[in-house]
Amino acid sequence: MTDAHCHLRTGAKRHLICEPFSGERGEGDIVFYGVHPWAFLPESEPLSVTWLQDLRERLINDPSAGVGEIGLDRLKEKEISLSMREGFFAQLSLAFELGRNVVLHGAKCWGQVVAAIKKLQEEFKEKALSLPKPSFLFHGFSRSGGLIPEIAKLNGFISVGPAVLNDHAANYRRLVAEIPSEILLLETDATSEENIASLEEIAEEVASLRSTSPSAIIALNESNLTRFLSH
C-alpha cells in the first residue's frame, strides 16, 4: 500500500514524502520539495534570500520530484500574511512552470487555495505553454463537500488521514463518505516515528464509512495514486 502523504517513511510499500522530512528515501518513494506555509509565520526562522532559486534547482536536478507541502494556513494565525501568500504563489507558479505535481496545505482556507490554482491555470493557459498539467493532492482537506466538485475539475485528489479514526469528528467522517471514488487517497501525515498512524486502520475506517471493503479502498488508493502521478 502507498502512503499518499507523510514526512518520513512509515512502513508502507511506497511513500509520497513531503518536506520537511527526515530519513532516507526508499526505492519507489516520490519526494516533494517545498516550503511549508508555517515557515512564513513571524515566529519562524527567516528563510534564505535564495530559497526560491534553491527550490528551483533542486526540482530541476530531481525530475521525478513534486512540489510540496505548500499552501496557506489560518490555523496558526487568523490572518494570512503577505509573505505567506507570495511564498505560496511563487511555489505554485514554479510547479506550473516545470509541470510538477503538488501537495497542498490549506487549513481553514481551502477556498483561497482553490482560487489561487484557478488563477494560475488561466495565466498559464494564456501563455499557451505545452507543459504537463500538474495534479493536486489536497492533504488533510476538511471543508464542506461543496468545494469537492471544483477540486475534481482542477485535477485534484483528496487524501484522508488519521482524523477519520476519531469518532467525535462527525463532520469529517461525513465528508469522507462523500468524496468521489476517483479522487480518494489515503495518508498518515506522519511527522515522527512516535505519531505514525496505521494506514490499514485508516483504510478499514474509510471502507466502513463508505459501505465497502478495506481491500476495495486499498485498490482505489493505488489506482488513484497512479493517475495522480501520471499527469
Report residues per predicted region.
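Mid-domain alpha/beta scaffold segments of enzyme catalytic cores
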Residues: 1-231
